[in-house]
Amino acid sequence: MSMKGQETRGFQSEVKQLLHLMIHSLYSNKEIFLRELISNASDAADKLRFRALSAPELYEGDGELRVRLSFDKDQRTLTIADNGIGMNREEVIENLGTIAKSGTKAFLESIGSDQAKDSQLIGQFGVGFYSAFIVADKVTVRTRAAGAAADQGVFWESIGEGDYTIADVSKEDRGTEITLHLREGEDEYLDAWRLRSVIGKYSDHIALPVEIETKNEEDGTVTWEKINKAQALWTRSKADVTDEEYKEFYKHIAHDFTDPLSWSHNRVEGKQEYTSLLYIPAQAPWDMWNRDHKHGLKLYVQRVFIMDEAEQFMPNYLRFVRGLIDSNDLPLNVSREILQDSRVTQNLRGALTKRVLQMLEKLAKDDAEGYQKFWQQFGLVLKEGPAEDANNKETIAKLLRFASTQSESSAQTVSLEEYVGRMAEGQEKIYYITADSYAAAKSSPHLELFRKKGIEVLLLSDRIDEWMMSYLTEFDGKPFQSVSKADDALDKLADETEEQKAAEKQLEPFVDRVKTLLGDRVKDVRLTHRLTDTPAIVITDADEMSTQMAKLFAAAGQEAPAVKYIFELNPEHALVKRASDVGDNEQFAEWIDLLLDQALLAERGTLEDPNQFIRRMNKLLSA
């Protein structure tokens, strides 16, 4: 084999790390290398079909796409060859020498020494071609891009360590041929029956024919036998597809090693005709919060693959959904730009969104434990829904889960339907509090009255919660009410007695004195009976920006208007009584500043001048 332009190049450092981790972590499930390589061949065939729609000459007179397996027991090699799109030299370097995924380095550094966990993570990452090194100590690739001249083939070879060799070679037929030089002890992959078994397990569902070489022992003639069904799984009747086949197809399209939580396979006829196969994964992808994270459905038009990651068919808050849509109503030459503005796309998006929400409703109803697993993985993403999808806001609200004062656990398990179902008699609102952490929410002084009255409060501590609640204003006809905002209904809950009213009258000069002292540092000063153990709190007016929202603005680098608090004092608390008796103005100011700082610290978690607070506290303690 004559080679030109030969050079040795080093792997990207992430590739070396991935190879090392993969070989050691995936060894117990090593047969998946065959699934990964056949899956790549299927993708290469899909890409050729799509490109050939506008350039049929790319078929080069051979439109029968397939992948072929052959082995040589003497040489101990296994070869997987396809006649798909193929690669040129630049594509080989990009696809086999680097990992073009942002966040890869951080992901690989996060992997520890737990092999079971590592294999899940690496599998989820999508090992693809590199899985060949699980069973091979050397891998040779010969490829030629469809439409390129025969002398524009590319040779690539590596032993899976620091570098690889690349060169230009001649290759008559297009496509990619991967030869695995098997490690000692891997002879099982030189057995036709073993290969049939693995392919039957992992690749029966793909539309690309998988053929295995058979030799006539008498005359040495070679024939190719198809060993998979080679019918696109989604085109088959649901009754003819087993759960195992659905699971394996998910792993094929999602490059995930774990079984999905649930799936929905539907064929729709009428105004629009399409087939959809949608999956809810069991775990979040490692890069779900990465800005460059690829998501979306595979798009087929009349069973012809058009594109991966068609984001237009699913709202962003459902970006974890995997699967495909096969439409009869879109043109074969559809582009991402056309999809963006297409009425067909908008209708499909609406229908598929409702389908996924129905899947989640069913999961929540039929399998509470399964839904809790889903919520732990994807709850934060689903919380984006009320802001993004006004049409389905009520349905999304039913799917939300919260921690609450009803439980001692931080687990988010309470649905809004459950909360409403056990509301206290006469309770008209759904009460909640937002905070930086579950502990801060649970210990907030704002909850004292509710504990006393036995009223449940939802405890919200995810960063997105405050933003979500600005869009989620009511559920089942009942408005949401933050317990840290001013509200007449909360004052009514306090059940103020005549005795308390009289005491308040006597304290009016004290309140006026506090107002004069604090001036415009606060919006107002008032007495409250919402507290039992705490001397003072700060709250915001109903129309004022909340503390948590101001923190969100700050975290995003945006300037938020200063929050003006209402300062509420508990007239029955010993510290407030003591402060009201102080005649000396300087000492009075120390007491009020201390009470205000305590209230601000409880509300915000920080103070502008903590040293001054400590100094003041020490001074009053030693007085």
Swiss-Prot record:
Gene3D superfamilies, per database record: 3.30.230.80, 3.40.50.11260, Heat shock protein 90, C-terminal domain (1.20.120.790), Histidine kinase-like ATPase, C-terminal domain (3.30.565.10)
Coiled-coil stretches: none
Gene Ontology CC terms, in alphabetical order: cytoplasm
Keywords per UniProt: ATP-binding, Chaperone, Cytoplasm, Nucleotide-binding, Stress response
Domain of life: Bacteria
Renumbered residue ranges of the record's region C: 552-623
Segments for region (A): 1-336
Function according to Swiss-Prot or TrEMBL: Molecular chaperone. Has ATPase activity.
Subunit description: Homodimer.
Family indicated by similarity: Belongs to the heat shock protein 90 family.
Database matches in HAMAP family: HSP90
Protein name per the record: Chaperone protein HtpG
Taxonomy of the source species: Bacteria, Pseudomonadati, Pseudomonadota, Gammaproteobacteria, Enterobacterales
